[in-house]
């Protein structure tokens, strides 16, 4: 168990790597908030399955690619009395196409979710972390950031 229970936020926390990270943070005693895409129709079933396996997550829907949506999300956390102490920027998408076949819309979507989201989600919480003298920010990147498809 950690010396102190912290509040952790995991973007993209409802699938794959994000779910594994959320579970690991829960396993060491942290309160874990997960962010999923707005309108995710399966979030209720996902939360129920997690609860059945002993994981208690609190889920919020937000468009991490949208700055205003992330500001609203930060307001919800504040209203719900959560101070974000651990932030894992894990949200990411891919568009499975070679660069030559990639449309501008797909390019823009990938950059907004994979890159802009780091700023959008981190910005509302970094000042509080600095003021409290404690905080952790982990940024996850895809292999496509190092080895793209050309």
Which role fits each region the language model picked out?
Residues 14-15:
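Conserved glycine-rich cofactor-binding loop
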Residues 30-45:
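Conserved glycine-rich Rossmann-like NAD(P)H-binding loop of the short-chain dehydrogenase/reductase
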Residues 61-72, 104:
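The beta1-alpha1 cofactor-binding region of Rossmann-like NAD(H)/NADP(H)-dependent oxidoreductases
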Residues 90-95:
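Conserved NAD(P)H cofactor-binding loop of Rossmann-fold oxidoreductase domains
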Residues 98-99, 106-111:
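Substrate-binding pocket helix/loop in short-chain dehydrogenase/reductase
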Residues 122-123:
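A short, exposed helix-loop element centered on a Lys and neighboring polar residues
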Residues 138-150:
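Catalytic loop of short-chain dehydrogenase/reductase
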